[in-house]
């Protein structure tokens, strides 16, 4: 395959107000502005959701700074809303299952079934897992929890070595690693 760096296009779209685009397939309450703002500042696209990233850093949620919440569209009440919606959906599904003559089992987006299938059958799969940093990321503390690509097969979960992260990203991550010790 070939490699195309889409960062310049993503940044230009954000600065022109064309990104992030509304999530028509998912939750429209979460606009991912924090994710793009951090991409602009850090030079790397953040894979964490805007809701979580706003919680993990001191820049977007501050006492007396409701203007930041509004500007970056941080959905402070998102998780309680999701819980209410999920509970209602589970009750609806329960009734459907109780009355169904047949139930079709489909894989979910959760990793548990993927991991179990890969270990049990030996069919390889790649997940992004939280594992102990045993030489995986050089400039983060050994023993801390890190999220890396992992190969899963009959041999179990095998994390991928990342190497050294850009120093400003490692420093930002360290602020959240500090609570692990």
Task: Identify the residue ranges that each predicted region occupies.
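Long, compositionally biased stretches enriched for glycine and/or charged residues
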Residues: 1-181
């Amino acid at each position: 395959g070939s490699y195309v760096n889409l960062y310049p296009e993503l940044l230009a779209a954000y600065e022109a107000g064309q990104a992030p685009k509304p999530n028509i397939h998912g939750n429209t309450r979460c606009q991912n502005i924090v994710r793009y703002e951090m991409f602009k500042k850090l030079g790397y696209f953040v894979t964490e959701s805007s809701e979580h990233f706003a919680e993990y850093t001191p820049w977007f949620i501050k006492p007396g700074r409701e203007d930041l919440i509004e500007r970056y569209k941080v959905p402070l009440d998102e998780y309680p809303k999701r819980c209410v919606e999920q509970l209602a959906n589970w009750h609806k599904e329960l009734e459907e299952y109780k009355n169904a003559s047949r139930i079709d089992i489909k894989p979910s987006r959760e990793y548990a079934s993927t991991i179990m299938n890969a270990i049990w059958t030996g069919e390889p799969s790649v997940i992004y897992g939280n594992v102990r940093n045993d030489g995986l990321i050089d400039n983060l503390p050994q023993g801390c929890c890190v999220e890396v690509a992992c190969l899963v097969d009959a041999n179990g979960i095998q994390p991928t070595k990342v190497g050294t992260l850009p120093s400003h990203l490692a420093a930002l991550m360290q602020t959240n690693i500090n609570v692990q010790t």
